[in-house]
Amino acid sequence: MDKIIDITNSSPKNYIRYFSDIFERGLTMSYGSGEVSMCSHMLQTAYFAEKDGATPELIVASLLHDIGHFGTDFSLDFSDGSHKYMLSATKDRLHEESGADLLENLFGLDVSEPVRLHVSAKRYLCTIDPKYYDKLAETTRHTFKLQGGNMSREEVQMFEAKHHAEAAAKLRRWDDLATHKERKIPNFEHYQILLEKLLKVEV
């Protein structure tokens, strides 16, 4: 397999190619219960966002919400069994922060901050609705514990006060629905024009 595109000191156009490359190669990397790939999961999340009439920024956030896993939880050799690695993890690697930091520079806060908050949104939803936890995939339950578990009352209030909290909660709900193997969804190219339009600098 060829080396993934190098984005060190890269142009915005190369970032789009980088994302496209990840979505193509990452189709072998399992997610959740192992029935879907990580990239299919992200595409499904974007599908739900678009279906529900989300803003363009939130659709892109949904599409790229787990991009921070690559290079943190998952190496870029794109080997299979990633969900098994997540089940055995003993430390939270803050993929939401890695992803959001990258996306903020490219697309701005309306894309980056729902991504940054989507882990907190899981904790929030499980706290305000205890039945929500029962809907989570096995790996998501495991990482929930690593990420802090249920929120305190103060944490709930702090989350609700954040500007992008509502968007993050919407993203999280789509995120947790996006685990079906047979669902027919658009591919990455379906979103490429939208990605290029939202870039903060010229492609």
What is each model feature region?
Residues 1-203:
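Metal-dependent phosphohydrolase cores
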